[in-house]
């Protein structure tokens, strides 16, 4: 899994929260995002996508799966913002997704597994730092 971890780390996770756009990186603090989260009363966050399940390209089904994920988020009434995961090298298509706020991480993990995902990115308002949460143990 080292190559997959390297790919996650070589990605910028863009979050469009209201009028703000935040560029998040695995393992890197983001004081502006942390400050925004605290102003909104948000304590934790996670980025999830429905694209390319199992880390295999699936362009033809990505749009439909993203809509289905958005419906699941609405059913839970989770606060969220649009996100886009962009590989730094441009060697993987951008993946639309969502940054979900203050949801139970275990529930998000199960949701991501249901969409065939390998991992999600989670963090807290403490410093806005995102970390990879691998889902293969579920």
PLM regions with names:
Residues 25-30, 71-74, 82-85, 89, ...:
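Mature, function-bearing regions of proteins
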Residues 38-39, 90, 110-113:
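A general structural signal for short secondary-structure junctions and capping/turn motifs
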Residues 1-72:
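N-terminal, charge-rich interaction modules
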Residues 63-107:
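Amphipathic protein-protein interaction modules
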Residues 94-97, 101-131:
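Short, compact, well-ordered microdomains
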């Amino acid at each position: 899994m080292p190559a997959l971890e390297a790919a996650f780390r070589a990605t910028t996770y863009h979050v469009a929260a209201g009028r703000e756009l935040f560029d998040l990186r695995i393992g890197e603090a983001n004081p502006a995002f942390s400050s925004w989260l605290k102003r909104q009363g948000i304590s934790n966050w996670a980025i999830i996508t429905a694209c390319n399940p199992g880390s295999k390209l699936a362009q033809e089904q990505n749009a439909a799966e993203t809509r289905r994920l958005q419906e699941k988020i609405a059913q839970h009434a989770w606060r969220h913002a649009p996100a886009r995961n962009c590989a730094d090298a441009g060697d993987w298509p951008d993946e639309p997704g969502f940054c979900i706020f203050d949801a139970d991480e275990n529930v998000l993990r199960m949701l991501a597994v249901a969409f065939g995902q390998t991992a999600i990115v989670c963090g807290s308002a403490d410093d806005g730092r995102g970390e990879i949460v691998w889902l293969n143990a579920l």
